[in-house]
């Protein structure tokens, strides 16, 4: 028993603690089911398309306001008041949702076109023409219907079934759909309708008198009327102007005239009666007769629109107990007027009635007054002495936040300007992670000054009251009034000497509490309404059984849930689907599952129409028209004549797909090859198919693709024949472009009416004298075309597509059995190669011409392959084994061989996928290799209206091979290819920069005389090609025509100024155009387009990056011996010349635009404007968001204008922005890294690369802890630091994971243009307490010293405590005659990118140098999970790892990390010289070394966003390292020096002198002008716009060397 209780208790405790896995699994399952149910419920909502262009905020407004709908925002239609206009359709659908489907409905003033488009045949619209605007609106609705019908007619479509009833009703009985009478006088009849009648009024009840509304509803026997109208509660407060902010509209009232208009746009206004609208708002009962009344009830308010319903009430159904005998006062007074004495008795009888009484009241809530207070504002005119006083509503939280804060100001700080500054700052928003962290107060900026004055006076009065209270009302000789004015005078000083007199005389301020009283307004106003009706009889309520309707609704709900999985389910017409299920007596769930399977391509059936609607399904499955109507007929008859001629005779050309309800069975196998003569004199109508968009394909995907290919041939044949028939019918209307492609021969005169560009046409269309049209296979003699006597005209085309399509149809017809193609079992391999990868070369190396077959799309490609294969003189490639695709299809069976072992298809992805499947089947091969490029131009369906579904375009293959090395493309094009292809694309070309572009002034400027074009000429469009040919250019082709070809030089031309869809960054046509050349490509264009942008980007790619794409063979090196020399710099004293303007000019040339920035008030702007920040988990003390006001001392003003910022003041926002920039949002780029093992390998490489061999093992006899090491550390500390250690007993360690956070007051200047678009964040300092530094400072100081002693100082420089002279000595033995690669590794976000792996590397280095295990573990834990506290700004957060900027190992730790990173990626054994300092590095390698992919390695292993730059001169720690033939000189960056001369933080002249001396120390080398030319080259390498700068270098020397002259660079700010 005890065991059972113990087990029960234990299980219960585990359940409570969350340790019970069964309970946890059940809870998770329950949570999952709940989420699934919720999402299913959301997907079942009605779908509404919102086509108006709206902003993201307005999108959120509409979505939140109408959760009943699933709204899709297309943003495809610009319109006035787009939000309100779009919401109108949502409001209409919401009102119609309230009405039972199919019930007779009156739409008062509605849009009858909207109901027709929705297929609502049960709605009657009353649309009276009350003014001219109504007539215009009604005509617009008619136009929309005509536009819709014309669009259907143009596409040969019919009105969908779900709209047919409504449109038929409108066509036959338009008065049943819409009338132009007012609703009160509408004559619409309800004879055939017996159900309940409903009405809706969408923004139309304004114009119906409220007293007539109930009677009008009763006259139409309306059961319930739903209405929507715009209104605002503030109109009940008798405001003359009210804004509706959400829809950007407003009401203006002038007497009884209420005007509604939209703001910020020019549109018509709407005027209504204010008193009439007020009745609709405030009344509850709308009498209809002496018995019935319509009672109003508000439903909801959405986006400034009020919804309500008017329900028909029979007052005789009221409980009889409410009846009583009372006095009808009106009847009594009326009778008394007739006679007082003689008819008194009669008057009392008439007034005594049986009455029913009821009453109701409505509370109107004023949301804008919630949490608001009424604040008085004061003003006075100094000219007229007229006083004004007004009251405004202001946020209560805002008012008391200001009052409470400024109440803490000291007497001197309590000034009007400080109050105004604080009010401005707290009005701005602070958003943290999308959530408002500081209260958002939307206070009108125009009121801030007046509000600040009120707050100031209110606080002054409060201070005085406190003083009086403290002194127990001992006021002394001064009165209360005098005290108040003393305080005000003290605040204003002598600025307004008569202000007290004016204020008192005008009685603007009363010295009472009421004068500055802040009141709370009422939130509610109640309106009452009373109903009085006579009682006569009782009526029983009817009973309605709704169970059946509920069951049907549940079935439909489940079916729609099934349909909701479709991507386009929002466009599925639910009403038509319901009607279809009812009319066909089909279970909705079964129908839904069939539709989902078909649309998801899971049923073996493909529907080629665009939208999955019931109307399109019906159109696809309906019977086609007969041949007599000129359309193709798909027949299901038995095949009596298995020939194309038989089909022609019957007027039928069969399709491989289904366009009826019976599968095609006319295509059967025929053993003998039929002749093309069967097409001769076939009627043109038998070949023309008017509509090809309703074809249904069945079977596996390959079968469907093959059927679609056959149908594409039929469609192409149909289109070509139809065009020639059109030309014959209207020869005179042929345009110029058509004349170049077609010809028309008049048979009687033997004259060409339209002369064709080619001759000897194989086919044409003949017009007989009987005006009949036939397709004819033409024959020629020496006089031309041989004609017949009954021919009138002959139309020919230069395109051979019809002739080839006829032949292909003849061939493919033989391969069908019972209308179904056979699919080959051969293995299909897709060889996906980049442009120029040698696909043709590979085919020739793999093919065996005795047993294999090569197929290519074009004749030129086939001839080229035969020529290359037979180049040795032995004929191996013939027309039997190297053929074009068209030749193989047209002449199938005529050759000696019909079966091949392997099939090679070049550029196979340019073919129709069904064509590829046919080729594999027809070759009878075992394996087929399809060579293509997935990113180049695919198969293009050029028959408009013919369906080619997207999933048909994907070729089904068994295996994919990739080729990613291009033998053709130069390096810059290879760089572009890497952006388009998966995997690394490499090249073998020696060309680096090959692309360029030129903007031409116009198309007319391109001609062979003034603009000869180099190499092959290409265009994007046929029209540009024809234009160039007409101007005299030769050998012009389109990009599509030369896919697969190679040219040395290419000139790409665009003459079309209008947008061309195929010219886009991700377009395959652009890819093909850029990859045809081997040496150069120049793009001539008349407009800016994406290709220009691509070429400009490629022109800016660094040559070093392009070297990374090159694939080279290894090179042999020969040892060379050169002389040994010692560094000695030539010294030439720099002349002291120049002026301030020289420095300003140089700065503006290097950094254009930076000096024009007015950034003195950037920090103030950030405080006063809205700001949105995204941060990680942290704690913010918002009470410190606004710092207490401080006196700002004037600083010296620089004469040199730079982008230097003013010193910043510490505060929550400033510190938080700095923390986000420096510590938050750290990159996460690294892959999976075995931290311990990888760190050990990296450290091994570090020691092997940098340390001397004899010092790679730690000195065990060396002690890290000694008095000498502590004394050395203490000697470097300030006295304040030593004082902090006075009470530290060193017994225990403080919290080593606790850090403090602060910011530097001066932002760091960047030598780029980012200051023009970014707010520079301050640098942060994250530091330990001095107690921790006292322990670990001496420790790591000794470890650093031991490390630096072990470094191979002849090759490596760890820049710690080194002078510029020592840097010159280190690089002094560089030989400028030896070719070198100067490499710089630029790492972004260096400190915060360091993670656990970096810490592991650093700890391993310290451990090997001798760090004790216990202290190493303590130090490790102190850098793992750390807490940052900023007491000044009120911020507390937690960080994992990262480099702390104020740590004792910050500098040396960063240095060893960058050195370790480079040692792990680069061949350090080949390094000549290397220098490391923090995150800076400079490396000198021999020319031609191979380097790995630095960016990838830095990302995956080191989590660094790194770029490796190859330069001519080094840049290290703000200094240029100039190596020359005599050694090396280090110049301080002159641009950085000029930037510092624009400093705005210099306090006084003494501070300026200290500043000058520090600059002199760092810029000492500028005194030597011997190497200014090399310095110019080095600066120009970094700043492309920098001019030669010797003049500015001399100017810097001049001013820095003269103390008095240097003072002229600044002005005294206190005197300005």
From Swiss-Prot:
This is Replicase large subunit. Heterodimer of a large and a small subunit. Its EC number is 2.1.1.-, 2.7.7.-, 2.7.7.48, 3.6.4.13. GO terms for molecular function: ATP binding; ATP hydrolysis activity; mRNA methyltransferase activity; RNA binding; RNA helicase activity; RNA-directed RNA polymerase activity. It holds the Pfam family RdRP_2. Transmembrane segments: none annotated. Residues 50-458 are annotated as: Methyltransferase. Residues 964-1116 form the (+)RNA virus helicase C-terminal domain.
């Amino acid at each position: 028993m005890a065991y059972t209780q113990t087990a029960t208790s234990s299980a219960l405790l585990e359940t409570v603690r969350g340790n019970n896995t069964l309970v946890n699994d059940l809870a998770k399952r329950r949570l999952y089911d709940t989420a699934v149910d919720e999402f299913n419920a959301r997907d079942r909502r009605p779908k509404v398309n919102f086509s108006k262009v709206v902003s993201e905020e307005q999108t959120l407004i509409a979505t939140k306001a109408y959760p009943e709908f699933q709204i899709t925002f297309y943003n495809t239609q610009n319109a006035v008041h787009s939000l309100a206009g779009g919401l109108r359709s949502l409001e209409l659908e919401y009102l119609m949702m309230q009405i039972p489907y199919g019930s007779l409905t009156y739409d008062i003033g509605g849009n009858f076109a909207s109901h027709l488009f929705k297929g609502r045949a049960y709605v009657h619209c009353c649309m009276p023409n009350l003014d001219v605007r109504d007539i215009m609106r009604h005509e617009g609705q008619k136009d929309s219907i005509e536009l819709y019908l014309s669009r259907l007619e143009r596409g040969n479509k019919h009105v969908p079934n779900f709209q047919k009833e409504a449109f038929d009703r409108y066509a036959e009985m338009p008065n049943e759909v819409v009338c132009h009478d007012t609703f009160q006088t509408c004559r619409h009849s309800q004879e055939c309708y017996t159900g309940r009648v409903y009405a809706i009024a969408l923004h139309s009840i304004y114009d119906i008198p409220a007293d007539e509304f109930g009677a009008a509803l009763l006259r139409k026997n309306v059961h319930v009327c739903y209405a929507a109208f715009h209104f605002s509660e503030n109109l009940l407060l008798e405001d003359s102007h009210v804004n509706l902010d959400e829809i950007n509209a407003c009401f203006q009232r002038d007497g009884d005239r209420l005007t509604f208009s939209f703001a910020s746009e020019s549109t018509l206004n709407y005027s209504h009666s204010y008193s009439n609208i007020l009745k609709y708002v405030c009344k509850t009962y709308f009498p209809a007769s002496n018995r019935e009344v319509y009672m109003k009830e508000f439903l909801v308010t959405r986006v400034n629109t009020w919804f309500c319903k008017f329900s028909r009430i029979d007052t005789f159904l009221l409980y009889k107990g409410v009846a009583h005998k009372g006095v009808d006062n009106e009847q009594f007074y009326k009778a008394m007027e007739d006679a007082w004495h003689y008819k008194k008795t009669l008057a009392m009888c008439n007034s005594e009635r049986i009455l029913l009484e009821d009453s109701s009241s409505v509370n109107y809530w004023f949301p804008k007054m919630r949490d608001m207070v009424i604040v008085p504002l004061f003003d006075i005119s100094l000219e007229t002495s007229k006083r004004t006083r007004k009251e405004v509503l202001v946020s209560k939280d805002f008012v008391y936040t200001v009052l409470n804060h400024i109440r803490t100001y000291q007497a001197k700080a309590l000034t009007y300007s400080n109050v105004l500054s604080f009010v401005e700052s707290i009005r701005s928003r602070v958003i943290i992670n999308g959530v408002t962290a500081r209260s958002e107060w939307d206070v009108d900026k125009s009121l801030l000054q007046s509000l600040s004055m009120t707050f100031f006076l209110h606080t002054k009065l409060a201070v005085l009251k406190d003083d009086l209270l403290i002194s127990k009302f001992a006021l002394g000789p001064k009165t209360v009034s005098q005290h108040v004015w003393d305080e005000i005078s003290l605040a204003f000083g002598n600025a307004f000497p008569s202000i007290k007199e004016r204020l008192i005389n005008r009685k603007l301020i009363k010295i009472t509490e009421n004068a500055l009283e802040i009141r709370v307004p009422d939130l509610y106003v109640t309106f009452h309404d009373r109903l009085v009706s006579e009682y006569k009889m009782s009526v029983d309520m009817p009973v309605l059984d709704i169970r059946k309707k509920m069951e049907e609704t549940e079935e439909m709900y489940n079916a729609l849930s099934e349909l909701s999985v479709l991507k386009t389910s929002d466009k599925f017409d639910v009403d038509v689907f319901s009607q279809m299920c009812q009319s066909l007596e089909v279970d909705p769930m079964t129908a839904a599952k069939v539709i989902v399977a078909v649309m998801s391509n899971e049923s073996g059936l493909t529907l080629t129409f665009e939208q999955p609607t019931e109307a399109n399904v019906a159109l696809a499955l309906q019977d086609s028209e007969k041949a007599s109507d000129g359309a193709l007929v798909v027949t299901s008859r038995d095949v009596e004549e298995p020939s194309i001629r038989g089909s022609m005779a019957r007027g039928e050309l069969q399709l491989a797909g289904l366009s009826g309800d019976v599968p095609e069975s006319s295509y059967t196998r025929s053993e003998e090859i039929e002749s093309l003569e069967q097409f001769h004199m076939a009627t043109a109508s038998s070949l023309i198919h008017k509509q090809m968009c309703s074809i249904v394909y069945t079977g596996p995907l390959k079968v469907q693709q093959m059927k679609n290919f056959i149908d594409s041939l039929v469609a192409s044949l149909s289109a070509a024949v139809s065009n020639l028939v059109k030309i014959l019918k209207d020869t005179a209307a042929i345009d110029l472009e058509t004349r170049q492609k077609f010809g028309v021969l008049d048979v009687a005169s033997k004259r060409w009416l339209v002369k064709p560009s080619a001759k000897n046409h194989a086919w044409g269309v003949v017009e007989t004298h009987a005006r009949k049209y036939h397709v004819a296979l033409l024959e020629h003699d020496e006089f031309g075309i041989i004609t017949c006597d009954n021919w009138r005209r002959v139309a020919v085309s230069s395109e051979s597509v019809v002739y080839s399509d006829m032949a292909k149809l003849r061939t493919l017809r033989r391969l069908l059995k019972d209308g179904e193609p056979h699919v080959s079992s051969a293995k299909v391999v897709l060889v996906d190669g980049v442009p120029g990868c040698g696909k043709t070369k590979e085919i020739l190396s793999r093919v065996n011409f005795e047993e294999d077959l090569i197929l290519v799309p074009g004749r030129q490609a086939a001839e080229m392959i035969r020529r290359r294969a037979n180049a040795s003189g032995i004929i191996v490639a013939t027309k039997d084994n190297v053929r074009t695709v068209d030749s193989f299809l047209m002449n199938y069976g005529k050759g000696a061989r019909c079966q091949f072992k392997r099939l090679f298809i070049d550029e196979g992805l340019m073919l129709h996928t069904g064509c590829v499947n046919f080729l594999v089947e027809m070759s009878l091969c075992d394996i087929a290799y399809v060579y293509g490029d997935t990113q180049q131009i695919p198969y293009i369906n050029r028959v408009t209206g013919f369906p080619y579904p997207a999933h048909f375009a994907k070729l089904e293959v068994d295996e994919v091979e990739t080729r990613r090395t291009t033998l053709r493309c130069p390096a810059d094009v290879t760089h572009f290819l890497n952006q388009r292809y998966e995997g690394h694309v490499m090249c073998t070309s020696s060309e680096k920069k090959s692309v360029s572009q030129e903007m031409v002034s116009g198309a007319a400027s391109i001609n062979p005389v003034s603009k000869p074009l180099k190499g092959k000429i290409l265009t994007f469009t046929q029209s540009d090609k024809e234009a160039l040919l007409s101007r005299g250019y030769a050998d012009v082709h389109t990009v599509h025509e030369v896919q697969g070809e190679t040219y040395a030089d290419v000139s790409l031309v665009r003459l079309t100024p209008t947008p061309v869809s195929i010219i886009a960054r991700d377009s395959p046509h652009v890819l093909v155009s850029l990859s045809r050349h081997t040496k150069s490509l120049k793009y001539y264009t008349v407009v800016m387009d994406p290709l220009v942008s691509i070429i400009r980007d490629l022109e800016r790619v660094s040559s070093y990056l392009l070297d990374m794409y090159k694939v080279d063979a290894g090179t042999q090196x020969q040892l060379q011996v050169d002389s040994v020399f010692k560094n000695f710099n030539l010294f030439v004293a720099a002349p002291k010349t120049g002026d301030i303007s020289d420095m300003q000019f140089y700065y503006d040339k290097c950094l254009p635009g930076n000096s024009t920035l007015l950034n003195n008030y950037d920090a103030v702007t950030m405080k006063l404007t809205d700001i949105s920040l995204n941060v990680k988990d942290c704690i913010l003390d918002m009470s410190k968001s606004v710092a207490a006001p401080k006196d700002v001392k004037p600083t010296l003003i620089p004469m040199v204008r730079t982008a230097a910022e003013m010193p910043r003041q510490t505060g929550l926002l400033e510190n938080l922005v700095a923390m986000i920039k420096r510590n938050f949002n750290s990159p996460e780029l690294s892959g999976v890294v075995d931290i311990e093992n990888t760190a050990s390998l990296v450290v091994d490489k570090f020691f092997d690369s940098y340390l001397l061999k004899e010092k790679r093992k730690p000195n065990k006899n060396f002690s890290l802890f000694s008095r000498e090491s502590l004394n050395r550390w203490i000697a470097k500390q300030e006295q304040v630091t030593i004082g902090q250690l006075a009470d530290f007993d060193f017994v225990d360690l403080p919290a080593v994971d606790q850090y403090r956070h602060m910011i530097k007051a001066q932002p760091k200047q960047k030598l780029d243009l980012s200051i023009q678009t970014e707010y520079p964040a301050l640098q942060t300092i994250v530091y330990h307490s001095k107690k921790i530094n006292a322990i670990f400072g001496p420790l790591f100081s000794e470890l650093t010293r031991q490390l630096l002693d072990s470094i191979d100082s002849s090759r490596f420089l760890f820049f710690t405590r080194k002078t510029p002279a020592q840097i010159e000595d280190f690089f002094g033995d560089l030989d400028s005659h030896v070719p070198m690669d100067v490499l710089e590794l630029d790492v972004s976000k260096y400190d915060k990118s360091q993670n656990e792996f970096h810490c592991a590397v650093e700890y391993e280095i310290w451990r090997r140098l001798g760090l004790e295990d216990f202290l190493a573990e303590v130090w490790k834990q102190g850098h793992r999970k750390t807490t940052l506290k900023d007491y000044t700004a009120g911020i507390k957060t937690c960080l994992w790892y990262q480099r702390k900027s104020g740590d004792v190992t910050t500098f040396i730790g960063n240095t060893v990390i960058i050195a370790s990173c480079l040692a792990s990626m680069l061949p350090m054994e080949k390094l000549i010289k290397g220098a490391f300092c923090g995150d800076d590095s400079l490396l000198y390698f021999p020319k031609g070394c191979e380097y790995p992919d630095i960016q990838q390695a830095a990302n995956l292993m080191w989590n660094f966003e790194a770029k490796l730059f190859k330069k001519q001169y080094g840049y290290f720690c703000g200094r240029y390292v100039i190596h020359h033939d005599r050694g090396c000189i280090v110049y301080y960056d002159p641009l950085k020096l000029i930037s510092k001369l624009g400093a705005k933080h210099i306090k006084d002249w003494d501070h300026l002198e200290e500043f000058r001396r520090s600059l002199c120390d760092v810029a000492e080398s500028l005194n030597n002008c011997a190497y200014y030319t090399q310095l110019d080259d080095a600066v120009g390498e970094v700043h492309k716009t920098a001019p030669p700068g010797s003049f500015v270098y001399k100017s810097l020397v001049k001013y820095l060397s003269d103390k008095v002259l240097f003072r002229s660079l600044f002005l005294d700010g206190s005197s300005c």
